[in-house]
């Protein structure tokens, strides 16, 4: 911090205006951190709590096969609830893809659960954004999808990490929390 402060004051001087600008910038950074923490408090309240058994489900994949959560028992599974029409979901794809790249070779399974209702649009988004991890869907709106009801998904993107014992390790809307958890446990 001394280096940043030194550089800042070298550039902007040591006057009251410079000190005020520095304080405002610091406060904005703190607000951003607090706002991010508030996202879970606002949007992840109905997702399964850590330590509860993750509900099993079976959904259709893009290639027409079925995928069940129970297929991956004994592994960490990251459930990525999303949709192609969701701007926040699209914004998070690079971070989720980065998580996949960093942890899939360590045995972590990533599974996209889409709330798209149009298979062509869903598939186009998967191809356009080069999403590498398996995808599944009921092709129903979020409020109508059984998997959304099972997991209490009210907001997307939402992420649920299921531990090898089948219990929820983390439920969040903040992808960086998934990285922190996997980095700690894997």
Annotate each PLM feature.
Residues 1-38:
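Bacterial Sec-dependent N-terminal signal peptides
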Residues 57-77:
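A short beta-strand-turn-helix
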Residues 91-129, 142-149:
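Structural microenvironment flanking redox-active thiols in thiol-disulfide oxidoreductases
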Residues 73-74, 81-98:
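Conserved redox-active cysteine motifs that mediate thiol-disulfide chemistry
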Residues 129-131, 138-184:
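Thiol/disulfide oxidoreductase modules built on the thioredoxin-like
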Residues 32-56, 70, 124-127:
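N-proximal helix/coil linker or "cap" segments that precede and/or mark the start of modular domains
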Residues 73-75, 105, 131, 153:
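Active-site acidic short loop of glycosyltransferases
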């Amino acid at each position: 911090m001394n280096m940043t402060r030194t550089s800042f004051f070298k550039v902007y001087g040591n006057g009251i205006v410079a000190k005020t600008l520095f304080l405002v910038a610091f406060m904005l950074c703190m607000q951003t951190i607090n706002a991010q923490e508030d996202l879970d408090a606002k949007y992840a309240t109905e997702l399964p709590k850590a330590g509860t058994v993750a509900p099993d489900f079976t959904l259709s994949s893009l290639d027409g096969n079925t995928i069940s959560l129970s297929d991956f028992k004994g592994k960490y599974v990251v459930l990525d609830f999303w949709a192609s029409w969701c701007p926040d979901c699209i914004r998070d794809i690079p971070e989720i893809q980065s998580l996949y790249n960093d942890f899939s070779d360590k045995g972590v399974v990533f599974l996209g659960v889409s709330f798209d209702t149009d298979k062509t649009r869903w598939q186009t988004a998967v191809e356009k954004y080069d999403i590498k991890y398996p995808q599944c869907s009921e092709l129903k709106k979020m409020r109508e999808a059984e998997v959304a009801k099972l997991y209490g998904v009210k907001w997307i993107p939402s992420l649920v990490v299921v531990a090898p014992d089948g219990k929820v390790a983390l439920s969040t809307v903040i992808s960086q929390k998934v990285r922190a958890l996997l980095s700690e446990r894997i």
